[in-house]
Amino acid sequence: MPPANANEYDFIIVGAGSAGCTLANRLSEDARVLVLEVGGWDRDPWIHIPLAWGRMMARRMHDWMYSTEPEPGMNGRRIEIPRGKVIGGSSSINAMAYVRGHRGDYDRWAGSGLTQWSYAHVLPYFRRQECWEGGTDQYRGGDGPLSTRHTTFSDPIVEAFAAAGAAAGYGWTDDFNGRQQEGFARRQVTIRNGRRCSAAVAYLRPALKRANLHIEVGAHVNRVLLDGPRAVGVEYASAGGDTVRAYAGREVILAGGAINSPQLLMLSGIGDPEELRSHGIETKVPLGGVGKNLQDHLSADVGYTRKTPGQFHREMRLDRILIDLAKAYLFGSGFASDVPGGITAFLKTGLDPKLPDIQFLFRAGSLAAQPYLPPFLPSFADTFGCRVALLRPKSRGRISLGSSDPRAPARISLNFLGVEDDLKAIRAGMRMAVDVGRQQPIAPFVGAEMTALKTDAEIDAHVRATGITVYHPIGTCRMGSDSDSVVDPECRVRGVDALRVVDASVMPDLIGGNINAVVIMIAEKAADMIRGRPALAPSNA
């Protein structure tokens, strides 16, 4: 048992990402909460300027710097997996997309035994989290912490791409987070007053004035402390290098995400006994599902050169972009206060007759963009394109320990294209994107097809050689009603009292879209469970 003079709290939350920030706000309304985050505070101006997300991704700023093991289905390449290592977690470095997924995703969860996670049950928590620019209706929330709106990026090529989608026979949806997901649509983003609205901005900062909420940055958690079958606290290395033990009177909650949470469970002796034994770790709780069931969205790009320079290229000239960045950071206005692209789409290949299985992410600028100033800094080629993402892969990977050293990175195997159906689906999606790019409305902008994909073999080779993730790893502490799951329907770790996992790792399978909104929803719903409060009434929308 912990000594009487220990650091004692009601709850200890490991990780201040999308879920951790949400939990910190809700639980500290009436309890003593310690949040441990290995990264630093989100004071870097680049975090808060929407346009700068590309720079942060390219330079892997505030990032765990994870990469996979060599991927057999991707020509043996190691694929980068950016994960936020900063207050706000990945919500502080992502592209700010606000996507809930398809209602069928949650009804599928309910059909597997997670009856309290149907669309009717989760919609009220999506509504509670957001402050939508259009106000409250049966689908949207108008007074929540997380600001959401349509992108305002304007360039004739954006409207042309949407028109090309219509010419190719695809419909339009005014709100893919509302009644209908399928179709082309304006992107929705988490931006407030021209600046990134991360989970830290939305949830954590408003709660910092509470004396019962303590945030410690630079804290690397080594293991969960167990007293018999009960979690009683954590051991961590502080920013100063000291080994510290903190104790939780009520619960320890892991919110480190789909890579770090299963790793911490295994380091604590909770996992597959054979794997733990291979690293010299004593098995405290045998739980074979820990680290299994890893999923992520695979994507590949269809690219074009642009005939005449567009707005993105013009604004990247050094003198202009410096002014734009200053305006965005200081006043939340101007070109850099939004993300270029404007259009997304959720489409059916026909391989899954019920749900859209492909997402388009249109980009109105070059992936290699850098500030330029002739004749001193040469310009980059002006390009645009469409990233095609496979929404519901059948392939499953895993997270395993690289070492018993808590500082050593976990081993990540995505197993992309491990199932043939995944290759068929993304191949079909790539063909759809190529077809849209050949429609008349977009033709005036197209200089040349950079990818020039015609045959199945060319598409397959392109995907294997260039495909990347969309940075949505989930599933490694799978929630379920069956004994093989890692957590039960209330996110409680099986076989351990007072220990929960609340983050993307508990998702049983991937939803049809970006996952930040989903992780916040899970944390909102879990907060009610943890506090013993009645769940919000199911929606009939």
Q: What does each model-identified segment do?
A:
Residues 303-423, 469-473, 501-504, 508:
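FAD cofactor-binding and catalytic pocket of flavoenzymes
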Residues 2-127, 286-287, 297-306:
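N-terminal glycine-rich phosphate/pyrophosphate-binding loop and immediately adjacent elements
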Residues 51-52, 67, 184-187, 191-192, ...:
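A glycine-rich dinucleotide-binding beta-alpha-beta segment and adjacent secondary-structure elements
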Residues 510-530:
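A conserved FAD-binding loop/helix module that cradles the flavin
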Residues 110-231, 235-237, 301-322:
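Conserved redox-cofactor binding core of oxidoreductases
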Residues 32-33, 39-42, 224, 233-324, ...:
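Glycine-rich loop(s) and the adjacent beta-strand/alpha-helix scaffold that form part
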Residues 165, 281-282, 431-438, 524-536:
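Internal hydrophobic alpha-helix adjacent to the cofactor/substrate pocket in enzyme cavities
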Residues 13, 17-18, 152, 258-259, ...:
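Residue-level detector of alpha-helix initiation sites
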